Every structure is written in C-alpha cells, then in structure tokens.
A protein has these predicted regions:
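Beta-rich carbohydrate-recognition and catalytic domains
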Residues: 1-268, 277-327, 332-376, 386-438, ...
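Donor nucleotide-activated moiety binding/catalytic core segment of transferases
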Residues: 373-381, 441-444
C-alpha cells in the first residue's frame, strides 16, 4: 500500500510556557511569604517588581492581571486591613505564580478535525485543527492546538504557533442542569434521603456556589453531624468541580489556547483527547472529544465539548461501562442513539450505544487481537470515519517488544458492531527514526481525516513528537475488502 510519510515533525518546545498558580505546601508558609513582602520598604518593592517584570519580557500576555488575581487569592492572609500599594499587590502575586513549560517533555497523540472556518482557501484545500497531548514538568499532560491545511495533492502546511500560551479562565458561576446532575449523583451512589433537602433547595439549573450553599445549610441540620455529612458533601462538590466550563480569549490564536488540568479528577493530566466533528440529527455541529482524566492514581474517561474552540465544557461520563481509557465517539448518531468504542478490559474493542451522551450501561465485544502485530492488545486510534463502504476505524495493535503499530478495520454502516473488513498487516509501524523516544517503538494516533480521496493520519512517534502520513482512501478500502474480517 502506498503510504506516504510527509516528513513533517512537530517537536516539543520548552520555550512555550504559561503562567499558573504556585501554592506553597501549607497555609503557614504562604502566610510567612506574605508577611515578608509586607515588611519591605516601598522603594524595595518597586525595585523588586521592576526586576520581575524586566526578567520576563515578551514571554506572557496579561501577566500583571494574573499577579493581581493571585494577590486576591492570598489577601485573606494579610494581618491588617491597611492599604496595600498596587506595586506591593503585584509583587505578592508574583510570589504565588510560576511558569510551566507545558510541552517540554513531549508533544504527541494527535487528533485531527476539520476547522469550522474554511474561508479564504485555494480550491481543493481544507483547513484542519490538530489537538495534541503536551507533557511537561511532573509528567502533567494538557491539550494544545495547532492549525494547518491540506491540499488536493495531500500537501500539508502547518501554521507556526505564536510565542504565547495562556491558560483559559474557568467560567464563574457556570450552570448545572439539575436533572443531569441528579442522575450522575445516583450513578455514583451519592443520593439518599439525607441529601434531598439540599437538592430540593436548588432550581432546575444552579451554580457551584448555590450548590455549596445548599449543602452547607442542609449540613447544619444533618443528624449524623459533620463526621457523616462532610465526606458526602465533599463528594457531591467534587462531582460538580469535575463538570465545569472554561473560556479562552476569543482574540487569541488557536495555538495559544490550552486545556490545562483544573478539576481534582484530572490534577495529574488531561490525556489523549480524541476530537470528532459531531453532526446531530437536526444538522447542528458540535466538536466533542473523549479524554482521560488522571489524578495520579485513577484514570477516568471524560468528555469535552465546544462549538467554537473558545468556550469548552468538560464533564464526567457515567454508567457501569465507563472504565479504563481510549474511548472514541462516532461522528453522528446511529439509529437515533449515540455510539462509542471502548476498551474496558484493556485488551479488546467494544461497542457501546446509548440514548444519553453522558451515560453508558452496556457494551458488546467487537474486535479481538487476531494478527501477531496485535496479540498483546488492540484499541482505537480515534473516532470512526464515515465512508460509502462503511465506518473506517483506525486501530492500534501491540506486538512483540511492546511495539505499537496502526492498522485499520471496516465496520458496517448500519450495524457498527459487525466487522466487514480488516487489514492483516499494519498501515504504519515505527521506522528506525520513529522508534526512538520517551516510549520506544510506538506509532499512535487519536484521530485522522479524509480529504480529496486521501486518508490523512497525524501520528505520534514514540510518545515524543508528531508527524503525518497520507494514503489513498481507495487503496485502504480495497485492501480491507481483500483481507476481509
């Protein structure tokens, strides 16, 4: 099969840094830091602040605004209510801020979707958005973005990123739908008669602060006291914090936007986003991605949704079949139901269907390892792609020496649990140049696309960098039909 490696390589760049909160290990240490800065003469404050601002020129946008926010977050530690000069406020804020090189270690596991803006392009050219897993200090992962174009001949051009990266702001007082939130509580076993008064005090939609207030009020009258009510209330608030909204600067370049861990469930990383352009039955278009939330001990599949790549809603997935990692949504409903591929057992690919996007209760086995290059395990490489021949699904297989390769299968268009074609050999296996990296002998993708009769595959090389390959779609489909299931 005529697979063309483009030679394009996206490598991690340790000069791309964002600012983020720095929190000392204890409130006592934070108090001492604030106290030390408060003792400085005003002239020394001015000198130190000038030094900070001079040391980081051109590295960040709106840094002084963030210093101000950081001061407000520790202002309660001040020992008096006396006035604090603007410069001293900013200097205190700088002591509670740090830089983070979000892609200093790796830039990998890409997924590709077609950009909502296709204007201003030559004929036969399409613009895409590439999501990437960026890994930095402490092996914390986030999701970054790039844009690019592919022409009718398969030529790919990536837009260079700007020199800035800015974490989004969490939307204040984002609303929760009471019905959906209640169902998630039920799934987690967090609802009993003792919680009812708090929920009844909430309207059909509510904010986090309203939820916390209702829980606080109910807790004061809880018969079991704080020892019983405290952990239950904390678990309910944790669920709310795992379902949140963020907003990026709409005037920023897409390469400046990042999905950085915020909730407790993802404190150690947002991993392997599999974006898909999802078309609802009414024709409306949404961009959705499953991702893996990691808190240092537990991995959980979660969902991110956006219409414009400016405002994002991140939410939990629920149900007995939500487990492990590597889930991928189909790009539309099938027979009126959402469909998603999964790998709960860590070895085989399953198909799930549900009438509700956030709840998954059943699965059926669809694909087992069958060829030597995938005897260890198989999984998906992103959402299935709809073709006239069926659903084209890229897979990854793990073989000898834990080598990861990319393969393909064809699923029935009306019954995607039925396999109608399967490659016996991989589409892509790591070459000598690709096998060297953080995790050797790996090629991997989180989502490809089809343009002008070509399958465009972004793929990572050994968990370190990212490249692209293209292959005629007809060649892939012909091989799938020839190899059968």
């Amino acid at each position: 099969m005529n697979v063309t490696r483009t030679g394009i390589v996206l490598r991690p760049n340790n000069t791309r840094v964002l600012y983020r909160p720095f929190a000392p290990p204890s409130p006592q240490r934070a108090t001492r830091i604030v106290g030390r800065v408060m003792q400085l003469p005003e002239e020394e404050v001015e000198r130190l602040l000038h030094g900070v601002m001079s040391e980081f020129p051109g590295r960040h946008q709106r840094l002084t605004g963030f210093f101000g926010e950081r001061f407000e977050s520790v202002a309660h530690l001040l020992l008096t209510d006396g006035p604090v000069s603007p410069s001293r406020r900013l200097l205190i804020g700088s002591y509670f801020t740090q830089e983070y090189a979000l892609e200093s270690a790796a830039l990998f596991n890409p997924s590709l979707v077609w950009h909502p803006d296709q204007t201003g392009l030559p004929g036969g050219t399409a613009r895409f958005i590439l999501s990437l897993r960026a890994t930095g200090e402490g092996h914390v992962s986030s999701v970054g973005f790039r844009t690019g174009t592919v022409d009718a001949e398969g030529g790919i051009v990536l837009a260079p990123p700007t020199g800035f990266v800015t974490a989004p702001r969490v939307v204040a007082n984002a609303t929760y739908e009471k019905g959906l939130f209640l169902r998630k509580l039920v799934e987690l076993g967090l609802v009993d008669g003792l919680v009812d008064p708090a929920l009844e005090a909430l309207g059909d939609s509510f904010t986090l602060s309203q939820l916390e207030s209702a829980l606080e009020t109910t807790g004061r009258h809880h018969p079991g006291g704080r020892s019983e009510w405290g952990p239950l209330a904390a678990a309910i608030v944790a669920l709310a914090k795992a379902n949140y909204e963020i907003e990026c600067d709409p005037d920023s370049d897409l390469s400046e936007r990042v999905l950085f861990p915020f909730s407790p469930t993802e404190s150690n990383g947002i991993e392997d986003a599999r974006f898909v352009r999802f078309v609802e039955d009414d024709g409306s278009v949404h961009y959705r991605a499953t991702y893996t939330a990691f808190d240092g001990d537990v991995t959980l599949p979660q969902l991110v949704e956006t219409d414009d790549f400016v405002r994002f809603r991140l939410s939990t997935l629920n149900g007995p079949e939500i487990a492990d990692k590597g889930m991928a949504l189909f790009p539309r409903r099938i027979r009126g139901r959402y469909a998603m591929l999964s790998r709960q057992d860590g070895e085989n690919i399953h198909l799930m269907e549900s009438s509700m996007l956030h709840f998954w209760h059943a699965r059926r086995l669809t694909l087992r390892p069958s060829s030597p290059w995938e005897y260890v395990q198989i999984g998906n490489c992103g959402s299935p792609i709809e073709t006239d021949a069926g659903w084209l699904l890229l897979t990854h297989g793990v073989g000898p020496m834990r080598t990861y390769s990319i393969g393909a299968v064809l699923l029935d268009i009306d019954d995607p649990g039925r396999v109608i074609g399967r490659l016996r050999e991989p589409l892509l296996s790591p070459t000598e140049n690709e096998r060297r990296g953080y995790v050797p002998n790996v090629v991997y993708s989180c989502g490809a696309g089809v343009h002008a009769g070509r399958l465009v595959i972004p793929y990572s090389m050994s968990d370190h960098a990212t490249s692209f390959a293209t292959v005629p779609l007809d060649d892939v489909l012909a091989a799938l039909r020839a190899d059968g299931s």
